[in-house]
């Protein structure tokens, strides 16, 4: 069963089964510990922005989930840059039932990983944790990773 459908089935009450489940998608953190001499920060910022834009669009596209925006006082509005209690409070204020957050970590010239977590905010419970490893630091490598995350989430 696709993860998104399984999550929604687990969360939905019979009365609200037809309503999309609101999810706050927190910007992912990015960490580069590769030690490469070339400054690639601009490329990484652009890739991460596109990754997040596409992820949010895909999650809301089928109608089972409704992506909600949270208000952040100052960037970065990420799990690494904002205390968890603040993110959770803001997600709840925005009406979210679920919260998705994660990190992309460039470990070496060729190896990166993407970690994604989904939390049920009402039950205060981690529903899903997935680690994807990927090879390469190119637009195509990031697109493949996003495709793998989409498949995992069922979007």
List each model region and its residues.
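Sec-exported extracytoplasmic/periplasmic mature domains
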Residues: 56-64, 92, 150-154
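Hydrophobic h-region of N-terminal signal peptides that target proteins for export
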Residues: 6-17
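A short, hydrophobic beta-strand-centered structural micro-motif
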Residues: 23-27, 81-116
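Short beta-strand->alpha-helix linker/helix-N-cap micro-motif
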Residues: 20-31, 35, 39-40, 51-83
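Solvent-exposed, acidic/flexible segments
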Residues: 37, 41-52, 80, 84, ...
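Bacterial N-terminal signal peptides that target proteins for export
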Residues: 1-5
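Amphipathic beta-strand/beta-sheet edge segments enriched in Tyr/Trp
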Residues: 97-138, 142-149
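Extracytoplasmic/secreted envelope proteins and their assembly/folding machinery
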Residues: 48, 52-56, 88, 142-146, ...
